[in-house]
């Protein structure tokens, strides 16, 4: 006897696991796995693991605005010396604007690193005494204040200067400094006035860079970084890799 043939309307019975060619595969269900590991506090690590933990924090843990305190101090010094830092409006993420001081720096590894700023300088009575009162131990600031006072005295306290940033680098020589003598008689300033004022203001930018570099070195020191790690209770693997 011949086997019965299938008609167009009939389908063969499918055995378990049978799949027609072209039909989608069932998605595999991947179950999550749990991995247990031992974590350590900073002081429980070996010396080599501590070095790795310190390096991690130096790269990831430093606040992006760590220099704001130095900028605020610098603006205070500028005010005492008679220099008004220029500000520009910047938009806030939540709406509105705030004023941002025109102070810049780059550092601290390349030969061209430094700091610069924009603003207007003019004579301010009692600047030398005010600077000494504010920073009694800072001989460099005293020297800058005295240099500005001396050149102002020779020009009857009528010198003014405008400082603007130029180029894409940030150091004392990326500032254009225009010095002039103002007054009703339109007298010429002394021959050394422009150089003396410019050099004193560039020294002020150098002083700012030194303050930034010292603050950065302090924040990156082993002791300060270790204290920050302890305060935040960060945890690490045995070889010093951060966990979390």
At which residue positions do the language-model features occur?
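Alpha-helical propensity feature that highlights long, continuous alpha-helices across diverse contexts
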Residues: 20, 27-244
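Short, Lys/Arg-enriched N-terminal segments with co-localized hydrophobic residues
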Residues: 1, 9-30
